[in-house]
Amino acid sequence: MSSAGVPHTDLWPLLLYFELVLVVVGTMLALPPFLGERRTRRTPATEQPYESGIVAVGSSQLRFSVRFYLIAIFFVIFDLEAVFIFAWAIAFRESGWPGYIEILIFIGVLVATLVYLWRIGALDWRTPRQRSIEATIHQ
């Protein structure tokens, strides 16, 4: 074996893998038009959502408040940070005092973020109109 380059005999697994990836991707792109759903005619029954045999009442398109998505994003962010805290708890003995100080800073940032979100009203589910009505009632 020469030190000038990689011998060609060592590259065959990589080339085979590349060719197989191309075949799989090509197959995945080529087959859907042949295997997919074909709609030849549209009827009112095919346009309705399937409700397990129950006649649909009203629209199947529900409108959710943007606040719902905002709360969901906050939940995902804080849940992910909880995973980091669990990982720190597993390595608690190995990290020592520096790790303890770092997790205190991390939790402090979490608490500061939560207080900030609470103060600006991002966690408040009420609309501005509901808040103003409540403020006039409590005066």
Swiss-Prot record:
Whichever gene encodes this chain, its name is nuoA
Compartment(s): Cell inner membrane
Function statement: NDH-1 shuttles electrons from NADH, via FMN and iron-sulfur (Fe-S) centers, to quinones in the respiratory chain. The immediate electron acceptor for the enzyme in this species is believed to be ubiquinone. Couples the redox reaction to proton translocation (for every two electrons transferred, four hydrogen ions are translocated across the cytoplasmic membrane), and thus conserves the redox energy in a proton gradient.
- EC number(s) of the enzyme? 7.1.1.-
Gene3D superfamilies membership: NADH:ubiquinone/plastoquinone oxidoreductase, chain 3
Q: Which PANTHER family match?
A: NADH-QUINONE OXIDOREDUCTASE SUBUNIT A, NADH-UBIQUINONE OXIDOREDUCTASE CHAIN 3
A GO molecular function assigned to this protein is: NADH dehydrogenase (ubiquinone) activity
UniProt entry keywords in alphabetical sequence: Cell inner membrane, Cell membrane, Membrane, NAD, Quinone, Translocase, Transmembrane, Transmembrane helix, Transport, Ubiquinone
What is this protein called in UniProt? NADH-quinone oxidoreductase subunit A
Per its UniProt record, what InterPro entries does this chain match?
NAD(P)H_OxRDtase_bac/plastid, NADH_UbQ/plastoQ_OxRdtase_su3, NDAH_ubi_oxred_su3_sf
Q: Enumerate the HAMAP family for this protein.
A: NDH1_NuoA (MF_01394)
- Organism of derivation: Methylococcus capsulatus (strain ATCC 33009 / NCIMB 11132 / Bath)
Q: How does it assemble?
A: NDH-1 is composed of 14 different subunits. Subunits NuoA, H, J, K, L, M, N constitute the membrane sector of the complex.
Query: For this UniProt entry, what is the primary localization, expressed as one broad class?
Result: membrane
Residues passing through the membrane, by range = 11-31, 70-90, 97-117
The protein's annotated catalytic reaction(s) are: a quinone + NADH + 5 H(+)(in) = a quinol + NAD(+) + 4 H(+)(out)
Q: Does the keyword Cell inner membrane apply?
A: yes
Q: How does it sit in the membrane?
A: Multi-pass membrane protein
Q: Which family does it belong to?
A: Belongs to the complex I subunit 3 family.
Q: Specify the enzyme's EC class, one word.
A: translocase
